[in-house]
Swiss-Prot record:
Main location: cytoplasm
Name this protein carries in UniProt: Arginine--tRNA ligase
InterPro entries: aa-tRNA-synth_I_CS, Arg-tRNA-ligase, Arg-tRNA-synth_N, Arg-tRNA-synth_N_sf, ArgRS_core, DALR_anticod-bd, Rossmann-like_a/b/a_fold, tRNAsynth_Ia_anticodon-bd
Gene Ontology CC terms, in alphabetical order: cytoplasm
Family matches, as CDD domains: Anticodon_Ia_Arg (cd07956), ArgRS_core (cd00671)
Motif position, 'HIGH' region: 120-130
Length: 563
């Protein structure tokens, strides 16, 4: 039984409000003793022409209370106390019958959602900042897919621009082929940095680089072969990280893919009378929207990011007919996307309202103990490997005889890092601290994983239990609170979709783990007072493990069965 929906249906029977609106208005009371659901009656004041607290009293008398222990008023709120036995039975039976599908729905059926995420720059380090977009995008992809949406994950590679002209010049002069084979990104970064150092002394290098890129744009064989080599070497390195994270994309159409589509976009903007000359550059004026102009072409005739993003959005709409197009890109790019979406609207593309920028914060290091290959850039692959190594050390201290400990360390170590990136509001900065990230206490990935492994250990020890569970035996506060939380999984997912915020699922599963450990510490499970209580509690453990596993899967994190 969906109690939130039941509350909404009962209110609808006595008001003119629609169920969808009522469900949005329903709140969870701040204190458990105030009930399980609360409906604020302010919305009804105009219709009923009474004060909200009087409306609450009137509804309390009229409402059908079947399925609820009681319905009470608290000022202008109508508070519902659910029938605990019915709720526990309904939730656990639903979880245990639906298993890995529990929490899913078909709400997005028939709707395409484009998710652009990760998008590293070719020939540049795949650094720790990139995990923010990669983890958020992957989680949103999985969450939306779980609710029936058809998702298209796009890795919009930074594989075009004048920097490739510079890299070609640098390659021809200074590349060490042996170093390139050993550490492609490191060597490409080294020669790119050297180009900038040398260009300060010799400005002719910049001219040469521009000519190289012009040749690349014109399809010159030599420049194109070098560009393809840079791209192949980079993707080989990037794929090591994607394999560690278990991430695959539906499309790798990056900036270069749109290079032959931009002239048509510029022409369309011009045809609409939007293109204005500004000191030799071509721009779209956005003064009336309190934004600076959106630059379409630089004074030298080169296109920039905005032009490519306009071309990409138009191509994606034509190709995928998306319901939503989500851009998981850092918060500093917020103005850029506002300019792009506004320009699309001015071009007559009303679907621009379906384009959403999902911003995120910065990654900071609590100390400088993370080794770096080049300067201050921390490579993501190194970070993940270090997390696995640190986790293996902890396992060797705590449980040296654990089977498959290397595999467990890999899942736990990588999962702990991903969990950290998804734990809080995405626009908050992350301060990276190994001690906190890998702790088995507190709001961490290992804490949630340990809760799951603890539950699985109980289930292995319990073995096959026969008979039908009597859920009325689960009468304690801890058992009810845990079951009630399990029943809220889909709500957490829908909140994550509504806010495009995976942390709604992460925070939810932390609360589930806390509630499970409270229950575990308060009650005997395998040594319960009788077999009926034991069976019911084992079923509660089984349902909890299923929900934790489902939630972590949505976040792109593997569970460990034992630790």
């Amino acid at each position: 039984m969906d109690y939130k929906n039941l509350v909404a249906e009962r209110i609808k029977e006595n008001t003119e409000l629609e169920v969808d609106l009522i469900e949005k208005l329903i709140e969870i009371p701040p204190k458990k003793e105030m009930g399980d659901y609360a409906f604020p009656c302010f919305q009804l004041a105009k219709t009923f022409r009474k004060a909200p607290n009087l409306i609450a009293e009137e509804l309390k008398e009229k409402i059908n209370k079947e399925g609820f222990e009681k319905v009470v008023t608290v000022g202008p709120y109508l508070n519902f106390f659910v029938d605990k036995t019915i709720l526990i039975k309904d939730v656990l039976e639903k979880v245990l019958s639906e298993k890995e599908k529990y929490g899913s729905s078909k709400v997005g059926e028939g709707k395409n959602v484009v998710v652009e995420y990760s998008s590293p720059n070719i020939a540049k380090p795949f650094h720790i900042g990139h995990l923010f977009t990669t983890a958020i995008g992957n989680a949103l992809y999985k969450i939306l897919s779980f609710e029936g949406y058809n998702c298209i994950g796009i890795n919009h590679l930074g594989d075009w621009g004048t920097q490739f002209g510079k890299l070609i010049s640098a390659y021809r002069r200074w590349v060490d082929e042996e170093a390139l084979e050993k550490d492609a990104i490191g060597e490409l970064l080294r020669i790119y940095v050297k180009f900038h150092e040398e260009a300060e002394k010799d400005p002719e290098l910049e001219k040469e680089a521009r000519l190289n890129f012009k040749n690349l744009e014109d399809g010159s064989k030599e420049e194109t072969e070098l560009w393809n080599r840079f791209k192949d070497l980079s993707l080989k390195e990037f794929n090591k990280v994607y394999d560690m994270l278990g991430i695959k994309f539906d499309s790798l159409a990056g900036e270069s893919f749109y290079s032959d589509k931009m002239d048509a976009v510029v022409q369309e903007i011009d045809d609409k009378g939007l293109l204005v000359d500004s000191n030799g550059a071509k721009v779209v004026m956005l003064d009336e929207y309190n934004m600076p102009p959106c630059m379409i072409k630089k004074s030298d005739g080169a296109t920039i990011y905005a032009t490519r993003d306009l071309a990409a959005a138009i191509y994606r709409k034509k190709t995928y007919d998306f319901h939503k197009c989500i851009y998981v890109v850092g918060t500093p790019q917020a103005l850029h996307f506002k300019q792009v979406f506004t320009t699309l609207k001015l071009m007559g593309h009303d679907w621009a309202d379906d384009c959403k920028h999902v911003g995120f914060g910065l990654v900071k290091l609590a100390n400088k103990k993370l080794s770096t290959r080049n300067g201050d850039v921390v490579f993501l692959e190194d970070l993940l490997n270090q997390s696995v190594e640190e986790t293996l050390k902890i396992i060797n201290e705590k449980n040296p005889n654990l089977k498959n400990k290397e595999d467990v360390a890999k899942k736990l170590g990588i999962g702990a890092v991903v969990f950290t990136y998804l734990k809080n509001n995405r626009e908050r900065d992350i301060v990276f601290d190994w001690k906190e990230i890998l702790s088995f206490d507190g709001e961490t990935g290992p804490y949630v994983e340990y809760s799951y492994a603890r539950g699985k250990s109980i289930l292995r020890k319990a073995g096959e239990l026969t008979g039908e569970a009597d859920y009325s035996k689960l009468s304690s506060k801890e058992e009810f609170e845990l079951a009630k939380l399990l029943g809220g999984f889909n709500d957490a997912i829908m909140n994550a979709i509504d806010k495009l915020e995976p942390a709604m699922v992460t925070r939810y599963i932390i609360e589930v783990a806390k509630a499970f450990n409270k229950f575990y510490n308060a009650h005997g499970i395998l040594n319960a007072e009788d077999n009926d209580v034991k069976l019911a509690r084992v079923k509660l453990v089984e349902a909890t493990c299923q929900v934790i596993k489902n939630a972590l899967n949505l976040l792109g994190i593997d569970v460990v069965e034992e630790m």
